[in-house]
Amino acid sequence: MVKETQYYDILGVKPSASPEEIKKAYRKLALKYHPDKNPDEGEKFKLISQAYEVLSDPKKRDVYDQGGEQAIKEGGSGSPSFSSPMDIFDMFFGGGGRMARERRGKNVVHQLSVTLEDLYNGVTKKLALQKNVICEKCEGVGGKKGSVEKCPLCKGRGMQIHIQQIGPGMVQQIQTVCIECKGQGERINPKDRCESCSGAKVIREKKIIEVHVEKGMKDGQKILFHGEGDQEPELEPGDVIIVLDQKDHSVFQRRGHDLIMKMKIQLSEALCGFKKTIKTLDNRILVITSKAGEVIKHGDLRCVRDEGMPIYKAPLEKGILIIQFLVIFPEKHWLSLEKLPQLEALLPPRQKVRITDDMDQVELKEFCPNEQNWRQHREAYEEDEDGPQAGVQCQTA
């Protein structure tokens, strides 16, 4: 039982979520709320990053589960020390962190929705991207030659320092992006700015790229287009990073190289055998057979070798197809009372039980728990002198 669930709620996962589920949740939310796409969601992006930083670290997650956010704060001498949200994003998507960003232009990260069929068969998709490119008219200068000057407000630092009093004898130093030069450290007189880029040095350009999704690739796998990201003056262009996002499939679930599916069979089929067909992800039809005399129990697993997912970079090799059988039992009174002895004669004999006078005979009814956990209501009943509240119910008919 965790103390609080705020970080889990931010990522939209349960406290029992696996590390892979936490990574997948962060990936989707970080791409959705990244400042480049949602400039007004900076605080949301920050909270998502903080939640992921804690829950992706087994030690921090354990501390959080036991003591909540307060325990995280106490573990950091009174205030939690979180990494930069952009550093977390870049490390997750392969950007390399702040130092790499200072030497290179921004990476452009895009999520590409794919089906399980796409990952099984391979597919090529075209993706239209918007990216920054150096302005050809001013060659990345931003204006006329010689018109660029050091920003007088921040003295070329790109940042402003503000001193704020937060209490008697206590002040706080706050660093913000310079409002005059927008963090560039330099400015251009409006009349001298380039007409094409308005002094921004770069312009937005649409580009179509072809993304080759190879057989066996996985959900969350990254495809890198080196040097195709945003361009900035005097910096090496960033990369375009495509992140595959697999849609849920109606029949199959993927587990590594294997495929898992559930198949319903009638009780007669479970006892007497059957032939069934399965449509594969490349539209072939498989015929599976359970021979007469073989008994399949509810929940039993069977497998078909070499019918799982192709293995990435070795597509001629495949995992296995795992089938879980769900046996459907007949409805009540499906057979007349007169015919039940005939059925019983065909089935294994019932276990005989010796009943004595000191035994209590009780009535067996269907268990129908309501939406709330029946154990909690039982505990409440034990503590409540007035008797049970609304809890476990049994059908009366």
From Swiss-Prot:
Q: Which residues carry this modification: Cysteine methyl ester?
A: C394
Q: Where in the cell is it found?
A: Membrane
Alphabetic keyword roster: Chaperone, Lipoprotein, Membrane, Metal-binding, Methylation, Phosphoprotein, Prenylation, Repeat, Zinc, Zinc-finger
CXXCXGXG motif repeat feature ranges:
135-142, 151-158, 178-185, 194-201
Is Zinc-finger tagged as a keyword?
A: yes
- Gene Ontology molecular-function annotations: ATP binding; Hsp70 protein binding; protein-folding chaperone binding; unfolded protein binding; zinc ion binding
Matching entries from SMART domains are given as: DnaJ
Q: Which Pfam families match?
A: DnaJ, DnaJ_C, DnaJ_CXXCXGXG
Which ranges of residues are annotated as propeptide in this record? 395-397
Binding, Zn(2+) 2:
C151, C154, C178, C181
Q: Where does Zn(2+) 1 bind?
A: C135, C138, C194, C197
Tell me the GO BP annotations in alphabetical order. negative regulation of endothelial cell migration; negative regulation of inclusion body assembly; positive regulation of gene expression; protein refolding; response to heat
Q: Where are the zinc fingers (CR-type)?
A: 122-206
Residues that bear Phosphoserine: S18
J domain segment(s): 4-70
> How is this protein positioned relative to the membrane?
Lipid-anchor
Q: Which HAMAP family match?
A: DnaJ
The protein here is known as DnaJ homolog subfamily A member 4
Native species = Homo sapiens
